[in-house]
Curated annotation (Swiss-Prot):
Any GO molecular function: tRNA pseudouridine(38-40) synthase activity
InterPro entries, sorted: PsdUridine_synth_cat_dom_sf, PsdUridine_synth_TruA, PsdUridine_synth_TruA_a/b_dom, PsdUridine_synth_TruA_C, TruA/RsuA/RluB/E/F_N
One Pfam family per UniProt: PseudoU_synth_1
Function description: Formation of pseudouridine at positions 38, 39 and 40 in the anticodon stem and loop of transfer RNAs.
Name of the featured protein: tRNA pseudouridine synthase A
């Protein structure tokens, strides 16, 4: 049977989600538990592979098992063995043809920034610190230009290996907070470092060093050298995974054009 698991984690002490040859990862923690329960290796398949230091309010993975265990018992068993910086929120049995990555229709990220005269040690690893004043209105104007279907070659890591760098963004906005701002972005999928590059560009806009009018040209240029900065990982949160059309239409309306993945090569 196939089991779907909904989790959250504080990513500061992880080298990312995906298992590494050395170092602590989220995948490693779960596969260690499943190996102990099954007495053999059990691979998990996530909806997203977050990078080092990135957090998740919501993340899904699935695995196959021949153990006859109720969902609530799976949840209890995992939470009993997990460290304090990971929590299993929900477990359910799904159809054997369901694939956590392939059937993912969208993701929402939130990037948190606080502004102050000096760095706050209690925000370390949780939010990104910026000392300068920012023009939120101009930042939001620029953020809106990213909504739609575009080739984001110029706004991702040059290490990105996927064939197509075309992604559809349903939401891209700056939300002012008491301490600074959040950048909230929802899309069909995201390229390596894409959200962090978008944030870095928007911060430059807020400082008056870049302009919203540049976005169209930069998207067409597809040149990462024109957008050289990447925001730190510490402020980034995977906030929501969209596994059904209903989830997307609930948030964005029935007229939304849903982008479907053609292969597992997409994020």
């Amino acid at each position: 049977m196939r089991i779907l698991v909904n989790i959250s984690y504080q990513g500061s002490q992880f080298l990312g989600f995906q298992i590494q040859q050395q170092g602590r990862t989220v995948q490693q923690q779960f596969e260690k538990i499943l190996k102990r329960m099954h007495r053999r290796h059990v691979r998990i398949h996530p909806s997203s592979r977050t990078d080092r230091g990135v957090h998740a309010y919501e993340q899904f993975f699935h695995f196959d098992t021949d153990l006859n265990i109720e969902p609530k018992q799976w949840k209890y068993a995992m939470n009993s063995a997990l460290p304090d910086d990971i929590y299993v929120k929900e477990v359910q049995q799904v159809d054997d043809h369901f694939h956590c990555r392939y059937d993912c229709l969208g993701k929402r990220y939130r990037y948190k920034v606080y502004q102050a005269t000096h760095r706050n040690p209690f925000e370390s690893g949780l939010k990104t610190f910026i000392k300068e004043d920012l023009n939120y209105s101009k930042m939001n104007e620029a953020a809106k230009h990213f909504i739609g279907t575009h080739d984001f070659t110029g706004f991702c890591s040059q290490k990105t290996e996927v064939e197509s760098k075309v992604r559809t963004l349903y939401q891209s906005e700056i939300i002012q907070t008491d301490e600074g701002f959040d950048y909230v972005v929802t899309g069909s999928g995201f390229l390596y470092n894409m959200v962090r590059v978008l944030v870095a560009f928007l911060i430059e806009v807020g400082k008056g060093k870049r302009h919203a009018s540049e976005v169209s040209t930069l998207l067409n240029e597809k040149n990462r050298d024109s957008v050289p900065f990447t925001a730190p990982a510490e402020g980034l949160y995977l906030e929501k995974i969209y596994l059904t059309e209903k989830d997307l239409t609930t948030d964005f309306g029935d007229n939304i054009k849903i982008h479907r993945k053609k292969s597992l090569q997409n994020d």
